[in-house]
């Protein structure tokens, strides 16, 4: 998208693919406390190389990303309302909480700029696949060491591993679908099986439920967006895949519930989650407009006024439910901003399914978004360090893809 010479352009494209692979692969694995710094280093090294090779810099260095305006609007509304809530509470801790949460969106803006400027798809997707493989191996090693302890790989908690795997499923499936090379299809299929195994080692029931629910909602979305464009055979294949995955996830949920000796009793299946939701509702009833304050849920939950009499679990900082967290901490305006963000993202991806030339990739992004959103109903997602950054990284990359596609279409007119 810039006016550098053809030779320089070829070097830049190759370098961008390698750097994107490193960025994606590193960003998926919390192998150290400063893991994301290494991912940023890969981006910055390429950026400096790009600046050097693109001299003299002109306006084309900054790509046209107007196609992502719905996503920009959603981010501004969501985090803007959270920040206003923090200022209204007047505590430094609340402001720092929101700023830290907004910090997780950095990969979105980096990848949007990067992908809108260069075609990094091959490198980025291969980096994601490599990161997924590392997560699988890491999880299997932990499971082998002690099968009774849920695997976490490099994540802070087993449910985060489930979230990370779920974010990557759709794109590994997309790569298997899009290639015509039989050997590559087998390779991607093997990776899918390994990811299924890693998901099992995490023992994350919420991840399984989110996966099956995401498939069902994505199927409904595709039928609505592409009505009249499906052939009967494709519909039956899609229904078969959804039915199979749903059956496997339901079986896994029942097995893990039995393994954890909770059964399907709603009072036990989620630990203290039901108590947390009830306590959160009481908190909101007492603080309807502005909530208890960002980052203050744990403080209020363990206070004598709101802590359940039968509660015994320690160290919780959220109710394992994203809408309820924002309702409790930020009031009615906070949860409204969260839903506005989700609706704008869904609308953006729905439009992409209808208008993009690559509908398979648009469907993969929609599936990843819906799985991530549904998982947020039973656990934390968008406020967690590694899963949150992964989600924004993938969303930013896809938004850059759409921006680049829009740019090329305008040039053909």
Which residues fall in each region the model found?
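Transmembrane signal-anchor hairpin modules in multi-pass inner-membrane enzymes, especially those
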Residues: 1-84, 106, 113-129, 175-186, ...
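Alpha-helical transmembrane segments of multi-pass inner-membrane proteins
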Residues: 19-22, 42-45, 83, 102-110, ...
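Membrane helix-loop boundary segments at the extracytoplasmic
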Residues: 23-32, 327-330, 361-399
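Membrane-interface micro-motifs in multi-pass membrane enzymes
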Residues: 30-39, 96-100, 153-168, 206-207, ...
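Membrane-interface helix caps and helix-loop-helix hairpins in membrane proteins
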Residues: 30-31, 87-96, 148-154, 200-205, ...
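A conserved mid-to-late transmembrane alpha helix and its immediate loop/hinge
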Residues: 196, 281, 289, 312-349
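A membrane-periplasm/extracellular boundary helix in multi-pass inner-membrane enzymes
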Residues: 201, 219-269, 278-286, 294
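Long extracytoplasmic/lumenal interhelical loops at the membrane interface
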Residues: 266-275, 290-330
